Structures are given as C-alpha cells and as structure tokens.
A protein has these predicted regions:
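N-terminal amphipathic alpha-helix/helix-capping segment at the start of soluble metabolic enzymes
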Residues: 1-26, 142, 146, 313-336
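Conserved, mostly hydrophobic/aromatic
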Residues: 24, 85, 154, 197, ...
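Glycine-rich, proline-tolerant flexible connector loops at the mouths of alpha/beta enzymes
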Residues: 29, 50-73, 107-128, 195-204
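Glycine-rich phosphate-binding active-site loops on the catalytic face of alpha/beta enzymes
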Residues: 51-52, 100-116, 254-268, 362-374, ...
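Alpha-helix-loop-beta-strand connector modules within alpha/beta enzyme cores
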Residues: 62-84, 133-147, 214-223, 456-458
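Glycine-rich tight-turn/loop motif centered on a GG-T
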Residues: 101-137, 164-174, 510-513
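Catalytic alpha/beta core domains of metabolic enzymes, predominantly
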Residues: 121-134, 166-282, 312-313, 317-378, ...
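Short, basic, low-complexity termini and linkers enriched in Ser/Thr/Gly/Pro
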Residues: 283-320, 376-398, 402-413
Length: 531
C-alpha cells in the first residue's frame, strides 16, 4: 500500500503527514474546567498510546483553563499535544490558540449560526459577501496561530453543516467537501500550512465518499494537506468498532489518512487499541477490480476435490437455487458453512469472505465448493480462530492432500459479526441501528448508562414489536451534531442541558427539557404511539 503524499503539519512535538507515522488520538469526556479530572483522563489516554488529546472548549472559561491543564501535564514531563475543540464561538478559538498545540474549528458553525434546516436564498454577490465575512474573521485567528505556532484542524461534520452551505449545494458529499474547501482556500492564500482536515459522518458511505471527493478536490487545486479520519457517532461495543473499521479501514487501505480517531461511546482510552489495530491491518487488496463469473474458475489446490455427495454445496449463480456454502479449516485452509435461502445473501457472504475482512487474525486459504467443482482463492482472512465453534467430523476428509482435516461449523457469533459488517457498510440491515456519540465535556447526562438502558429497552420492545428492529435511533450528548445527525435517524435522544433531554423524530424536535430519569421511557412511548 502506498500512502497518499501529504505536506507535513507540525503539532507541538509531533508531525502529522509528510511521511510521519499515522497518529492516534482521542478526546476527553470530562468537564474542561476540572483541571484534575482532565489531567487524569488525558494521562490514561496517553498511557494507552494516544499521541494527541482533544478537549472541548465551549466557552472562554474552558479555553482559558487549557493553560492550566497543559501546565499540569508538562509539570509531570508529559509533552503530548493538546487540541481545543471549538464550536459556535470564533472568539474562543482565538483564546485557545494561545494555550494549545492545535485548535479544531468547525466550518459549519465558526461564523455561520447553528443550522435550523431552513433554505436560504443567495444571489452570487450575496454568497460571495458571506465568504468574505468568513475570511475577515478567520484570518485574524490564523495570525494568532502563526504567532503561537499552533496548528489548525478544519473539521467538517455532516451533522453540523450550515444552512448557508446546504442551501447553496444541497445535503450531499459535494457540499460537505465545499464546506471544507472554503476554509482551506483561505489558509492557502494566507500561506498557513500547519493544517489538518477532517470530514466525518455517522454514515460510513457518506464519510468514505466525502473524503475521497475531498482528496480529488485538493489535488485539483494542488493542495496536499494531511487528513484526520473518523466515523463520528460510531457507537459502542462491537458495533462501534465494526463501523469505525469499515469507514476508516476503507480509506486506510487506499493509502488515505494521516491521523485517526475511533469515536466510541466508552471511556476514551478504549479507543486507542482499536485505532492501533486499524493502522496495522490494511494490506493491498490482491483481487482485480474487474472479476468474471467465479463459477468459471477452477482450483488445482486440492489433490482430490470432493463431490456434492461428500459435502453440501451451493451454486453461487443466482439462476440456481442455493443450498449451502461449505468451508472447512485445516491450518491455513478455511471453509465456512452457510445455509441461506436467498442467492443474493449467499453471494454477499461469499464476497465478504473472498474480500478483505477487517477483523484481526491470521491468514487462511479460502475454498468454496460449487456444483462439484472447487473454487479456490487465497486471501488474508483476519478472523480470530476462537470465533469458530469446533466439532469433530464424523469422518475424515481430504483437504490440500491432508486426510486429517476436521469439520468446523460456523459459530453463531461469527454469523452475527458478518451481519454487523454488512450493516455497518449499509449493505443490509438486520437489527436496530444506533447512532451514538462518544460524549465530551459538553455532555451533561450519563451517556454510557443511557445507551445501555435504551438498548435494553428497545431489545425488549422488539420481542413483541418487530418494528423496533428496523429503526435507527440517535443518542447524542449535545446539540453540536445532535439535530443534524437526527436527519439520518428515525428517532433521537439529545442532551439539552444538565440532566435534561430533547426527543426528536427525524430532525424535528418533538419534546424538550425532559428530566433524564423520564426520558428513556418517554422515547419508547413516543415510538410506540408514532407507529
């Protein structure tokens, strides 16, 4: 894999891009005014291997306290760069730039007001005037950054695009890219080069498509700034890790990405090992871009191919009714048993195994039986062997000339994993989809506990109402991305103040300021009534 060429960006004592290693980072969830708590959490992130630590700075007090947090860490000999996360207030960015190694600004709300989903009409002259207004405010900030050797991340989130940009370009990957490019062009004109860019979305397809378009847009204008990758609001547990792997991994495998953050609704230090595994995982994909009918391919890898009478087989052609795809394992040879009624399902599972799965493990030989013929393909299948439930075969069979192979059946958890990968890639939905942010210092309720309660309540409700399995539910810490990401959700639960919650149907707020203790049940009741 050849990494995309990028110019170096200097962030404190590290470099992002320019051939430097891919950096891993996370973000604190503590109150930024609580110096002791922030330092303790930052140290946990750093001990796990984090190379940058981001903190929310929603106001002047938080921005000013970054000085104390930085001093406390440096007093212990910790020089890890700190990043201030700024939304809605350009003045806060000016303050933070004096005390942090990097400041993240959001083009969606740096000068523009928070989105209201209203369509705004602009003449060309009026729109240019809006761009001039942004430049007049952004350039003084860049000058402060130059003075203090502070880097900048231009971080666009799909959930917080401005009404201005959406009215002009629509809610598409192209408008996400343009939101970023407007600010980037100012940086280039001002010869400000310590820049990192990010485009994030909870939808992996939107995220990957937008980043690819951004790379093309930069290349067209001779820009080669480094990229920060992440799937925002990925969730927690296995689903959060899979969604992050699908989005971030797809781009890393193309050589795109200079720093990554895996956004999990968990303790921030849990994100670091996942990020490190993703960086270590991508390999060049050996499969050709154009493939013929796999049923025309024959294998010579087995000394004695088995017939259908020896082992169940399934045609991969949609014109023939499917029965079973059987796969066996011996050392580095893997056969997987499936039992799908739908030909498309068979092809999806077969394609997934023949591609490049993103789960950590060792390489195997993949063998598929089709109409009595052996179709063989060597791939690096990253699957932990303990994911398989083993059972002794009632007879020996031959595989790669070895008569000592044993039959393995596919563990149900691996089938669930396969379904989760397909859902994360937005190919097929088989369960409730959760869009949940990792939380930060802006979150004023128990986010992790709430996610667990909502999941448990929805799972129980789904036992009697299958509709719950088809829903997308957003669980957001605050309003920065909350309302915007609700546009991709059926229902939403968004923090609205200390222990207060707002409920959404799509992007429409249906009830405000609900006490946290009542909000989960109110969400369930609303979904039931809305059905």
């Amino acid at each position: 894999m050849k990494r995309r060429f990028t110019t170096p960006t200097h962030v404190g004592n590290i470099t992002i891009g320019g051939g430097a290693p891919i950096r891993v980072q996370s973000m604190t969830t503590t109150n930024t005014n609580d110096t002791e708590a922030c330092v303790a959490q930052a140290k946990r992130i750093i001990s796990a291997g984090g190379e940058l630590v981001r903190l929310t700075t929603q106001g002047r007090r938080e921005a000013e306290n970054m000085k104390n947090i930085s001093a406390a860490l440096k007093a212990e000999g910790i020089m890890t760069p700190l990043v201030a996360d700024v939304h809605f207030n350009a003045n806060v960015a000016d303050i933070a730039a004096k005390y942090c190694e990097k400041v993240r600004v959001n083009p969606g709300n740096y000068v523009d007001p928070a989105r209201t989903f209203k369509h705004l009409e602009y003449t060309d002259e009026e729109y240019q005037a809006e761009l001039k207004r942004i430049e007049e405010r952004f350039v003084p900030f860049l000058n402060i950054c130059k003075e203090h050797h502070t880097a900048v991340r231009i971080g666009v989130n799909h959930g917080s695009l401005s009404d201005r940009i959406m009215s002009r370009y629509g809610d598409t990957p192209e408008d996400i890219v343009e939101s970023c490019m407007e600010f980037l062009r100012i940086c280039k004109r001002e010869n400000f080069n310590d820049v990192v860019l990010s485009i994030k979305a909870s939808n992996t397809v939107v995220m990957v498509t937008s980043v690819r378009l951004l790379v093309k847009a930069m290349d067209k204008e001779d820009m080669h700034y480094p990229l920060h990758l992440g799937v925002t609001e990925a969730g927690e547990g296995e689903d959060g890790r899979i969604k992050s792997a699908v989005g971030i991994g797809a781009l890393l495998s193309e050589g795109i990405g200079d720093t990554i953050r895996v956004s999990l609704s968990e303790e921030p230090e849990n994100e670091i090992p996942v990020a490190k595994k993703l960086i270590a995982t991508p390999t060049p994909l050996p499969l050709p871009e154009e493939r013929g009918d796999v049923t025309d391919v024959k294998s010579e890898n087995l000394s004695s191919p088995l017939s259908p009478s020896d082992i169940p087989s399934t045609p991969l052609s949609p014109s023939v009714p499917p029965h079973t795809v059987a796969r066996w394992i011996k050392d580095d040879v893997l056969y997987v048993a499936l039992n799908e009624d739908d030909a498309d399902d068979v092809k999806l599972y077969a394609a997934m195994w023949a591609g490049a799965p993103l789960i950590d493990g060792k390489a195997h030989e993949l063998v598929i039986y089709n109409k009595g013929e052996v179709i063989s393909s060597s791939e690096e299948l990253r699957v932990k062997s303990e994911e398989f439930k083993l059972r002794e075969a009632n007879r020996d069979c031959q595989s790669n000339g070895n008569p000592d192979s044993s039959l393995f059946t596919l563990h149900s958890s691996l089938a669930d994993l396969s379904a989760s990968i397909l859902q994360a890639a937005r190919v097929r939905f088989t369960k409730t989809e959760y869009i949940s942010c990792p939380g930060c210092g802006r979150t004023l309720y128990d986010l992790q506990g709430t996610i667990a309660r909502i999941k448990a309540a929805v799972s129980k409700a789904a036992e009697t109402n299958p509709r719950f399995k088809t829903l997308k539910i957003g669980i957001m810490g605050c309003i920065v991305n909350g309302p915007g990401e609700m546009a991709d959700a059926d229902y939403g639960y968004v923090g609205a103040g200390p222990n207060k919650i707002s409920l959404y149907k799509g992007k429409e707020c249906v009830e405000k300021a609900i006490p946290e203790a009542e909000a989960v049940q109110k969400l369930l009741d609303f979904i039931e009534k809305d059905a």
